[in-house]
């Protein structure tokens, strides 16, 4: 958010620019007390994105976010959980797997490309259907 404010202040974002924030499904999905602070920060990021999108749409500066749920990364594989816990977590996803890093990249590339020229203020949820339940 601070970087975006500085870019705007210094007029470094030209017309026809696109800004994509990497947020989280936690910002739009039910949370537990274990990750409430994380969810609040992601909800705040999404609110900032929508406000910036509305404020700068007339200059054709687009703001969007990619909101992934669990992504299969090295960091995720280093979390010490049992196979039973992992299976219980995966059971929450209608598509029975975690996301892949390249799926986040593809959504981001789309939002930065001309293919999404009419897209602003949008959160793309990459969550295997998690937020449907």
What positions do the PLM features span?
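Active-site loop-to-helix junction immediately N-terminal to the catalytic Tyr of the SDR YXXXK motif
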Residues: 30-39, 51
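Alpha-helical segment proximal to the catalytic Tyr-Lys
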Residues: 9, 54-55, 117
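A conserved structural motif in NAD(P)-dependent oxidoreductases
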Residues: 93-104
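Residue(s) in the substrate-gating loop at a strand-loop-helix junction
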Residues: 24
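Short, flexible catalytic-loop segment of classical short-chain dehydrogenase/reductase
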Residues: 28, 67-78
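Short, small/polar-rich loop/turn modules that mediate ligand/substrate recognition or access, typified
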Residues: 57, 62, 119-121
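Short C-terminal tail/terminal secondary-structure segment
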Residues: 109, 120-133
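Active-site helix of classical SDR
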Residues: 4, 41, 49
